[in-house]
A protein has these predicted regions:
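Charge-rich, low-complexity intrinsically disordered and helical linker regions
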Residues: 459, 474-477
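Conserved micro-motifs of the catalytic ATP-binding
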Residues: 572
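Positively charged n-region of N-terminal signal peptides that target proteins for export
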Residues: 1-5
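Active-site-adjacent "gating/activation" loops or surface patches in catalytic cores
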Residues: 252-320, 324-336
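Bacterial N-terminal signal peptides
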Residues: 6-17
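Alpha-helical support elements that line or immediately flank enzyme active sites
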Residues: 309, 353-357
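Short, structured secondary-structure elements
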Residues: 22-240, 244-247, 314-354, 364, ...
Length: 610
């Protein structure tokens, strides 16, 4: 008989955990990773790459950990440190820096499809702030994911609800995305039929979907209730703005459940039959029945099951993703399909990484620290794996910067290291609009709450008066418009602080930033359009002509010093003798420092992570 899991027993099993490990307890794991890879390389008659120089290491680790190149001062600080473990010290410093939060937000933004707007439901700034807070506090990955899956309430007061509201109109797609993103479970086919290649069946899929059956995802186009409420005192635009953070919510709905579809074609269930929730397993045993006296707990049961230490897929999925982040290719590709672990390039390595993730209690920083301290990470890059062969990690794979790394590095050249501390936070503008009272979420019945809503709105306006007409100041005081139409220095912020995503014509999108319509959609392929933008774009011209590095170079007294500074800041190295001769000759022929900066920014050495 299938095993029965109760709500209380599952909770009890999940709270039994070991004490948090202190930094350094898992550093021996770095050597174990190296040993696993060396053994695999020998098995395939391959050799590890040579160690990287300090210059190569510092540029690589800055890009991989905080998403930008190092400044000249940061270079000086590193080389002034005479300690033997200065690389490890730098890794620790970067993992705890504000830049790491910014870089990880970009990485998760692509994975979680983070957008400013979810199809007319309004801004999702509370989600941005919530996610950045989790990263800043180094919230364990399992707890972060749990919070997104069990979140309830209004978007304006609980930013974590935005994850489920993202696909509110497509609950089955939402489950598919969740299982694919967090478990590497390729279940898309199973929505309509048994998977032709994996062990997933359509019944399995619906049994998992039923954990969300009692949850209502209310994603309302607030233009309709705004029309219902509108009168001469308040413009439609202001009403839409006011209602958006209040009418988007995740709630339990009594009596709601999941049924098999009317066209269900298999013999193991009947069309229209009520689905009994069951957990899928990967141990060869049958799915486990779930019993609970309160259907409201089903979503929590699912979240705790999915993120449990005993579920190897959850740990392996995020470990595989982080490995790809640092090495350019995952142990098991694609990262969205771990259904056949034996197909991984190195199954033993993937299992070890999954166990390591559990051992560090899903501490993402600590896991990254272990990877970054491996000899494997600190070896020279391979340009490309042999054609038709698996990449076996003699070192990282040579790869282009992501769009966000390129943008943030150029913004650094423009403004300096202060960019790591420049933050935008528009969540308070949403939070102040949350109604402090219950109201009808029914578009037709909301008219009964008109006076309560208007009385509350009056308290938000500085002069106590309602703005008249569509041109009124509005409750956001134009903040949403200002954020999209950034100009001059206000636009030179890190990618994490700009609208998510940027418009298609912006540097970031042309360079490969994800549209955030599907997960993991960012591109590092490059192309003619990106090359033309780097050569002729307005932002490149700004860096060439008005940036801090150009001004700093101009203050140097000799051409040699000027050229050396440009090389250190753009390429993280000193110019070679031939480089110096060519640059001096160019200056003597009438070119200036901005031309040298242009050449460096358009070099392969700048755009590739070596």
């Amino acid at each position: 008989m299938p095993k029965t899991i109760t709500y209380c027993s599952l909770l009890l099993s999940l709270v039994v955990a070991t004490a948090n490990a202190s930094p350094g307890d898992f550093i021996g794991a770095s050597s174990q990773i190296d040993a696993i890879i060396r053994l695999d390389l020998r098995k395939h008659n391959l050799q590890p790459n040579q160690p990287v120089s300090d210059i190569q290491f510092i540029r690589r680790v800055y890009l991989d950990v905080i998403g930008r190149i190092p400044t000249d001062k940061e270079l000086e600080s590193f080389f002034a440190d005479s300690r033997e473990d200065r690389r490890s010290k730098l890794i620790d410093q970067l993992l705890k820096s504000p830049g790491h939060e910014s870089h990880m937000f970009n990485w998760l933004g692509d994975m979680l499809r983070v957008k400013d707007d979810y199809y007319r439901i309004g801004k999702t700034w509370t989600f941005h702030t919530w996610l950045k807070t989790q990263l800043n506090e180094n919230r364990p990955w399992d707890e972060l994911v749990q919070d997104m899956l069990i979140a309830e309430g209004r978007l304006g007061e609980n930013g974590a609800t935005a994850y489920l509201l993202r696909d509110a109109s497509m609950p089955l797609d939402s489950l598919s995305n969740t299982l694919t993103t967090f478990l590497g479970a390729n279940v898309a086919c199973a929505q309509c039929h048994d998977h032709p290649f994996a062990e997933w069946t359509q019944r399995d899929f619906y049994e998992m979907a039923s954990f969300f059956g009692s949850t209502a995802f209310e994603r309302v186009d607030t233009r309709k209730p705004a029309i219902t409420l509108r009168d001469e005192r308040f413009s439609k635009a202001n009403l839409v703005t006011l209602l958006q953070p209040n009418m988007q919510r995740v709630v339990y709905e009594e009596g709601r459940a999941t049924d098999y579809p009317d066209d269900y074609a298999y013999d193991d269930a009947q069309p229209g039959e009520r689905v009994v929730p069951k957990f899928i397993t990967w141990s060869g045993s049958r799915p486990a029945n779930v019993t609970t006296n309160n259907p409201r707990h089903l979503r929590k049961l699912f979240a705790y099951w999915m993120t449990a230490h005993e579920n190897p897929r959850f740990a392996e999925a995020i470990a595989n993703r982080i490995w790809k982040k640092f090495f350019g290719v995952a142990v098991k590709e694609p990262v969205t399909d771990l259904d056949v672990l034996e197909d991984a390039t190195n199954p033993e390595l993937l299992k070890f990484l999954g166990q390591l993730m559990r051992d560090v209690d899903f501490d993402i920083r600590e896991f990254q620290r272990v990877i970054l301290n491996t000899n494997t990470y600190q070896q020279q890059v391979s340009v490309t794996p042999p054609e038709g062969e698996d990449f076996r990690f003699p070192g990282p794979l040579l790869r282009r910067m992501t769009a966000e790394q390129a943008w943030d590095s150029m913004v650094l050249l423009q403004r300096g290291a202060e960019i790591d501390r420049l933050k935008t936070n528009n969540a308070p503008m949403m939070e102040r609009l949350v109604f402090p009272f219950e109201f009808s979420h029914d578009t037709k019945r909301i008219v009964h709450d008109r006076e309560k809503i208007f009385d509350f709105a009056r308290t938000l306006l500085p002069d106590g008066q309602f703005p008249n007409g569509e041109g009124g100041r509005g409750l956001f005081l134009g903040a949403s418009q200002r954020r999209v139409k950034l100009r001059g220095e206000d636009s030179w912020l890190r990618a994490s602080e700009l609208p998510q995503p940027m418009p298609p014509t912006h540097f970031l999108r042309i360079a490969g930033q994800s549209s955030r319509e599907v997960a993991d959609d960012g591109s590092t392929e490059g192309g003619i359009t990106e090359s033309l933008m780097m050569m002729n774009g307005e932002f490149t011209k700004s860096v060439m002509n008005t940036s801090l590095i150009i001004k700093a170079a101009q203050r140097k007294s000799t051409q040699v010093e000027q050229i050396a500074l440009l090389y250190r800041t753009c390429l993280t190295r000193l110019p070679r003798q031939q480089d110096m001769r060519q640059c001096i000759a160019a200056l003597e022929q009438g070119l200036d420092l901005s031309d040298i900066a242009w050449a460096l920014l358009n070099s392969r050495e700048f755009i590739f992570v070596q």
